[in-house]
Amino acid sequence: MKQPSATNLCFTGNSTVKQPTPFDIGFFLGILVGEGHFGGDGRQPQITLRMHTRHESLFRWIEARFPGGKLYGPYEHGGRRYYQWMARGAFLRTELMPLLDERLTPELDSKTFERFSAMKARYRL
């Protein structure tokens, strides 16, 4: 069995998850701003990303760099084939919220900022 290198070990000696690069973060947040939905199910907040199945490789990229969300599908509804990725719970609160709080401003995209702010207010984030 191949041993992990010293460059990808944390202090416990376990392999660490590769941290997203600044490009990864910016690209991912751009996708969320352009295609994401900020809301919830009435009980808990969630960020949802729904796109056509032709974007499967993009969803796999998201899964590899931002593990913690959940990918559903493919689905077919109304003649449309799509995947749906969702972020909820601890992953949303501890991983995505800080990224969005630090980077999403009304000057960048006022509509998305309003939706994000409404989600935070409704679910007391």
Please place each PLM-identified region on the residue numbering.
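Internal intein/HINT superfamily modules and their associated LAGLIDADG
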Residues: 1-125
